[in-house]
């Protein structure tokens, strides 16, 4: 254990940074500083006391982050089940600190700086794979406005950013413990600085030299689709297509009875669809559950949408939501083609256990069009990187992800989807009922945005969207980077356990 009379000051400062490093209020720099300070606190405290205090701090802050983000009704078991779920989830971000505190003294020198990033990535990966709510809480989601850094997710997935942030904390504490003696720590600091600089430089070059070539004005006709989507995650030159997306004009939650107001609302959506089509939109997308209907009216809704799509020569994605009597609710995305045919019929496929809707078949929707290959998912589906990777592997160019949020996850939920777009080389149209709607290109630039809680008059969103996506290394190799971290951590833990057994025998 290291001695530091300022130990509790680092705890206080670390807790303040932690509060603003995720959840409702994100200050990107705080996400880098919080682990640096909290690791310092833990390494200067007895193991048991330090971890107990850290667990309490994480529990309180996690509750503040997510108390209104996760509706209590989503978790079975009533209030007790909800509190147990919150307590369990708060332990996930604590895990890397506990592993670091256990192993930091067993792996000396610069190699010890890797314990915290390896364990951070391993636990984030496990969370994304096993958590029924998806990969919420990743450090990567705190850095989405840093576009040069964000480009690394096209290679490593979201875990590359998390690794760099956590490694900063590991290197910083190693240098701190050495008294910042440059002769001892200089080469290690330079190595970390070189890695981070190369990531930022590579991302900056990708943004500057291989960005989408934006066509000016609106596109009224088809665009020839190129077979080559680019190589090594560098895009071909591309044109754009005008995409319009529409939200609910009055926000309401699912599960309420169908009313005549819903019928009038659907009429307004069709009127807006025709208006945007005649203004040049070739693709029109409705937000999740925009069409609250009686189960018996689904066929009529689809027929009407098909007629509008054929009449206006557009691709129209509609979002019916209905609750058959005595059955689970149905949450769909249906794409109608300019020929009046159904291009896809997609059921929401993730978080259904919590929402209680009919489970989809587990395949991301896709359709080939003159404007590129479209892919489709719904809202919460975007929180699962191992699911949305299907879009990247299918060579999707534009992804339509109708969504429905609430104030407490605005804008957090949109930021998660932004990372998915860059990971998979797709431009993303995400229109949210009751939250931040945004269009991102495949490098994470914001092409359009509108927030239901800010805009009260017209929530239509229009953008010129690249018709060609780009292949990414992440889509090709999947979570290889995360698995390498898991393997390296297992090797370190195994070595530590063997050393412990040898010490006990002696």
Name these PLM-found stretches.
Residues 43, 177, 274-278, 310, ...:
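Residue-level signal for alpha-helix termini/capping positions
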Residues 203-354, 367-370, 374-376, 380:
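Soluble catalytic regions of membrane-associated enzymes that act on cell-envelope
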Residues 1-225, 407, 420, 440-443, ...:
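Membrane-embedded alpha-helical bundles of multi-pass enzymes
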Residues 33, 136, 238-240, 330, ...:
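A structure-centric signal for secondary-structure junctions around beta-strands
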Residues 23, 327-329, 433:
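Short, basic and Ser/Thr-rich N-terminal targeting/leader segments
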Residues 96, 100, 269-274, 364, ...:
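Generic structural signal for well-ordered alpha-helices
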């Amino acid at each position: 254990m290291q001695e530091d009379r300022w130990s509790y000051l680092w705890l206080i400062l670390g807790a303040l940074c932690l509060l603003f490093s995720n959840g409702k209020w994100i200050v990107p720099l705080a996400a880098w500083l919080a682990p640096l300070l909290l690791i310092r606190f833990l390494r200067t405290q007895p193991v048991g006391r330090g971890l107990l205090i850290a667990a309490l701090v994480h529990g309180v802050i996690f509750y503040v982050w997510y108390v209104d983000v996760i509706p209590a009704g989503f978790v079975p078991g009533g209030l007790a089940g909800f509190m147990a779920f919150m307590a369990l989830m708060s332990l996930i971000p604590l895990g890397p600190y506990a592993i670091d505190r256990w192993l930091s003294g067993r792996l000396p020198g610069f190699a010890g700086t890797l314990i915290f990033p390896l364990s951070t990535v391993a636990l984030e990966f496990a969370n994304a794979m096993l958590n029924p709510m998806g990969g919420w809480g990743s450090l990567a989601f705190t850095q989405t406005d840093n576009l040069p850094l964000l480009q690394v997710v096209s290679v490593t997935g979201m875990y590359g950013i998390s690794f760099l942030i956590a490694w900063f904390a590991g290197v910083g504490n190693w240098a701190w413990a050495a008294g910042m003696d440059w002769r001892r720590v200089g080469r290690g600091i330079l190595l970390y600085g070189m890695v981070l600089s190369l990531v930022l430089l590579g991302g900056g070059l990708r943004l500057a030299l291989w960005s989408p070539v934006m066509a000016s004005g609106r596109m009224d006709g088809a665009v020839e689709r190129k077979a080559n989507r680019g190589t090594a995650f560098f895009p071909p030159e591309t044109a754009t297509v005008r995409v319009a997306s529409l939200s609910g004009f009055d926000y309401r939650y699912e599960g309420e009875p169908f009313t005549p107001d819903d019928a009038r609302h659907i009429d307004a959506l069709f009127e807006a669809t025709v208006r945007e089509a005649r203004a040049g939109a070739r693709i029109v997308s409705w937000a999740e559950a925009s069409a609250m209907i009686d189960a018996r009216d689904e066929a009529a809704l689809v027929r009407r949408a098909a007629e509008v799509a054929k009449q206006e020569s557009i691709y129209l994605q509609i979002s019916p939501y209905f609750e058959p009597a005595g059955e689970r609710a149905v949450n769909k995305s249906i794409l109608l083609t300019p020929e009046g045919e159904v291009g896809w019929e997609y059921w929401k496929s993730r978080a259904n256990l919590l929402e209680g809707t009919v489970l989809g078949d587990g395949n991301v929707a896709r359709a080939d069009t003159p404007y590129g290959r479209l892919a489709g998912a719904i809202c919460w589906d975007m929180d699962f990187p191992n699911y949305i990777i299907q879009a990247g592997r299918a060579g999707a160019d534009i992804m339509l992800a109708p969504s429905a949020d609430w104030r407490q996850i605005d804008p957090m939920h949109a930021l998660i989807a932004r990372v998915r777009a860059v990971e998979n080389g797709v431009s993303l149209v995400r229109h949210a009922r009751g939250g931040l709607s945004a269009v991102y290109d495949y490098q994470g630039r914001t092409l359009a945005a509108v927030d239901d809680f800010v805009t009260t008059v017209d929530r239509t969103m229009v953008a010129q969207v690249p018709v060609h996506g780009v292949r990414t290394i992440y889509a090709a190799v999947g979570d290889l980077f995360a698995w390498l971290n898991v393997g390296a951590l297992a090797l370190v833990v195994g070595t530590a356990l063997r050393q412990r057994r040898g010490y006990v025998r002696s």
